[in-house]
Amino acid sequence: MSKHKLIILRHGEGQWNKENRFCSWVDQKLNNDGLEEARNCGRQLKALNFEFDLVFTSILNRSIHTAWLILEELGQEWVPVESSWRLNERHYGALIGLNREKMALNHGEEQVRLWRRSYNVTPPPIEESHPYFHEIYSDRRYKVCDVPLDQLPRSESLKDVLERLLPYWKERIAPEILKGKSILISAHGNSSRALLKHLEGISDEDIINITLPTGVPILLELDENLRAVGPHQFLGNQEAIQAAIKKVDDQGKVKQGKQ
């Protein structure tokens, strides 16, 4: 029996999403389409009469800005927003900044799919010579995390994402839900997938088939033990959502004529 409702979403589109590049921990802002996606998400939640008590985000701009725009559309700007690196996007290591389609050309579509969607496969780690290494690790936000800078990841599998996310879920988010508070989590594709895997009991093998489009609210109904009652539900125009999911899936494929 459903006792709690939780809204999770992947942030609105950023420029690197549009350019089909691995964004990861690079702090890209929302582009114009992403701004509209976030506002539309807020409008959908308003139409469904959602009222939030607390919002959780990563410490990346695109996650935070999406949450702000949603709250603005809801007229709930006063709702507290808490940010943690533990909700950050998956760290894609040496793949950061690279184009997914070009990677598929060079390494094959299946390898790129494993890097993007599998549970256990970890991309090569980021090195200090990487063009975005210092932009990430010199940023002040990573010097005030709950782990030392030298213990932050240099690359992650989805399994790693879940392992760093779960303590925050159990210690900070879950207790608020159990108090009866209405929670919104504005996160990223892979931190959201990791959380869905945990709450829905999705297998290591099946998680590769879960794809989340940008800027679409996801409803999870949870029981008294915070386990999902039924599968997650995308809120909005289902035909448009399925088209958006296919678009995300196709990012790691080589377009016809280039093979």
From Swiss-Prot:
State the InterPro entries in the record. Answer: His_Pase_superF_clade-1, His_PPase_superfam, PG/BPGM_mutase_AS, Phosphogly_mut1
Active-site residues annotated for this sequence: H11, E89
A GO BP term here is:
glycolytic process
How does its record describe regulation of its activity?
At alkaline pH BPGM favors the synthase reaction; however, at lower pH the phosphatase reaction is dominant. Inhibited by citrate.
**Catalyzes what?**
(2R)-3-phospho-glyceroyl phosphate = (2R)-2,3-bisphosphoglycerate + H(+); (2R)-2-phosphoglycerate = (2R)-3-phosphoglycerate
Q: Which Pfam families match?
A: His_Phos_1 (PF00300)
Cross-referenced Gene3D superfamilies: Phosphoglycerate mutase-like
Annotated EC: 5.4.2.4, 5.4.2.11
**Broadest EC class assigned to this enzyme:** isomerase
Tissue-level expression reads:
Expressed in red blood cells. Expressed in placenta (labyrinthine trophoblasts).
A GO molecular function for this record? phosphoglycerate mutase activity
The protein's role, per its UniProt record: Plays a major role in regulating hemoglobin oxygen affinity by controlling the levels of its allosteric effector 2,3-bisphosphoglycerate (2,3-BPG). Also exhibits mutase (EC 5.4.2.11) activity.
Q: Which HAMAP family match?
A: PGAM_GpmA
Q: Which family does it belong to?
A: Belongs to the phosphoglycerate mutase family. BPG-dependent PGAM subfamily.
Name of the featured protein: Bisphosphoglycerate mutase
The organism named in the record is: Mus musculus (Mouse)
Name of the gene encoding the protein in the UniProt record = Bpgm
